[in-house]
From Swiss-Prot:
Gene: TRMT2B
EC number: 2.1.1.35, 2.1.1.-
Subcellular location, principal: mitochondrion
Name the record gives this protein: tRNA (uracil-5-)-methyltransferase homolog B
Active site: 451 (nucleophile), 497 (proton acceptor)
Keywords: Methyltransferase, Mitochondrion, rRNA processing, S-adenosyl-L-methionine, Transferase, Transit peptide, tRNA processing
GO biological process: tRNA processing
GO cellular component: mitochondrial matrix; mitochondrion
Family: Belongs to the class I-like SAM-binding methyltransferase superfamily. RNA M5U methyltransferase family.
Transit peptide: 1-16
């Protein structure tokens, strides 16, 4: 009924989050762009139940018939390369202009559903709300395109497993699922988002593996040694390679021999063609582990790579987070800086700060920058970057934001103006971080950056904007979503950064 006001209990939040999940439910994408060839109107109108990337790949393969899972994989050919491209870069068949239309439509639909739910939580009639731009209460800006469309990744991680020809020493990306037992590792040199240098290093690592007497570690309990390869590059062309190795029961002497062999291969052997700036080796018995859990061992070269961004020289350690599209990151960080509205009286709180680029780029415009980051190496990089660039009004703290933030805020006076910037991982922010932000009255402006606004990130936004809830210890006034800016850092994929400005 028109004008009906109703409050939605917060316990129904789980249902809403399941409905707003990116590319996971029918009708989420409006697809108002021109229909790509081979995509049916039914598909375009109901996108899309199930896995988005799989549906995209299927619909884009015009005229291809479905095939049963082969009893043997056979040689590598164009079909394997296309299948991998459809999984890793499902929008690769569209022009970049069409890709941007798809992404903008998706972000708009997510915001519409999110706003509608928040309005109901606050007892506002959705039918009488006055929109600012096309059914949205917040101002949705046009999507900012990536300055670089192809080969934009500055970091790639390659797996090792059986290729289409059955060779277990194949380096690339996975097709299939472990559940179905049909995982195939396909070389990635044809993917549009991978730079040639990354593919070159991966190819030479494959050459090395195939001449090594040691087997790869495909499944932990089955033994094997050689594991994944990570390649990092900067805009100057410097290249860092990180090889992960399962030590099994090798002695330190035996491990030393293997490190010397791989080092020799990339310095004086065939791998010298890669021109690596540095080579790291990490012994790991876990799927993934940090430098603190298992130190990265520098076999040769420089311990860091450096990047120039926003007039800063930035140091990047092997496991430090840095946006994978450097040129796009500059657009993203400029957008964040503009939305913060900081001035010389402002304290900038940079939560999940990584190497500290956002805070440090705004340091000259603020009274102080306070950064919080989980990874010690990233914090060390941020401190180095601050010192090298002559920035003296910043401090960075290592640890979990939910443990550090409450104490950090208590030490500040209520009269100080604080602007918070959060750029969490896809898992979102811990609920105690949300509590601390909501309950600290001096935070009037919050900029939230999300590369995938669903799941916990959606819950974060809703708990920032919902009415005070003593049961959840959300006592402060709610934030209001004012502006949203999509920034494309991931051409050829459905992903997109979304920068949200909240005030109260």
């Amino acid at each position: 009924m028109a004008g009906l006001k109703r409050r939605v209990p917060l316990h129904s939040l789980r249902y809403f989050i399941s409905m707003v999940g990116l590319f996971s439910k029918p009708g989420l994408l409006p697809w108002y762009a021109r229909n790509p060839p081979g995509w049916s109107q039914l598909f375009l109108g109901t996108v899309c139940k199930g896995d988005f990337t799989r549906v995209i790949a299927t619909k884009c393969q015009k005229g291809q018939k479905s095939q049963k899972k082969p009893s043997h994989l056979g040689p590598l050919d164009g079909s394997w390369q296309e299948r991998l491209a459809d999984v890793v870069t499902p929008l690769w068949r569209l022009s970049y202009e069409e890709q941007l239309k798809v992404k903008f439509a998706a972000q708009k639909k997510i915001l519409q559903r999110l706003e509608s739910y928040i309005q109901m939580l606050n007892g506002v009639s959705v039918t009488t709300a006055v929109p600012k731009s096309e059914r949205l209460s917040c101002l949705l800006h046009p999507i900012i395109p990536s300055p670089v469309i192809n080969g934009y990744r500055n970091k790639s991680t390659f797996s090792v497993n059986r290729g289409p020809d059955g060779n277990p020493k194949t380096v690339g990306f996975y097709l299939g699922t472990w559940r179905d037992g049909n995982v195939v590792c396909v070389q990635s040199n044809h993917l549009k988002n991978i730079p040639e240098k990354h593919s070159q290093v991966a190819q030479y690592y494959e050459v090395f593996l195939r001449q090594s007497p040691l087997e790869p570690c495909l499944v932990f309990h089955e033994g094997g040694y050689w594991r994944e390869l990570t390649v990092r590059t900067n805009s100057q062309g410097h290249t860092m390679a990180i090889i992960t190795f399962h030590p099994q029961k090798l002695s330190q002497e035996e491990l030393h021999v293997q490190k010397e062999i791989v080092k020799e291969f990339f310095i004086r052997g065939p791998g010298a063609a890669c021109g690596l700036t540095s080579l790291y080796f990490q012994e790991s018995t876990m799927t993934r582990c940090s430098h603190q859990q298992s130190p990265y061992q520098l076999l040769f070269g420089e311990p860091y790579i450096f990047e120039e961004l926003l007039s800063l020289k930035i140091r990047i350690s092997p496991d430090a987070f840095f946006q994978i599209n450097t040129a796009g990151a500059e657009m993203l960080y400029r957008t964040v800086g503009e939305l913060t509205g900081v001035n010389s009286d402002t304290i900038l709180l940079d939560i999940c700060c990584g190497t500290g680029v956002i805070g440090l780029s705004l340091a000259q415009h603020t009274s102080r920058v306070l950064g919080i980051e989980l990874l010690e190496q990233a914090v060390e990089d941020a401190r180095w970057t601050a010192a090298f660039n002559g920035i003296t009004n910043s401090e960075f703290h290592t640890g979990q934001a939910e443990k550090i933030l409450p104490g950090l805020l208590k030490s500040k006076e209520d009269g100080q103006s604080i602007v918070a910037v959060v750029n969490p991982a896809r898992a979102g922010l811990h609920y105690k971080v949300i509590q601390a932000i909501r309950n600290f009255r001096a935070i009037h402006t919050l900029v939230f950056v999300s590369c995938k606004l669903h799941g916990e990130s959606t819950r974060n936004v809703i708990e920032l904007c919902c009415p005070p809830d003593p049961a959840k210890k959300l006592l402060g006034e709610p934030f209001v979503l004012q502006q949203a800016v999509p920034v494309d850092l991931f051409p050829h994929t459905p992903h997109c950064e979304l920068v949200l400005l909240f005030t109260r």
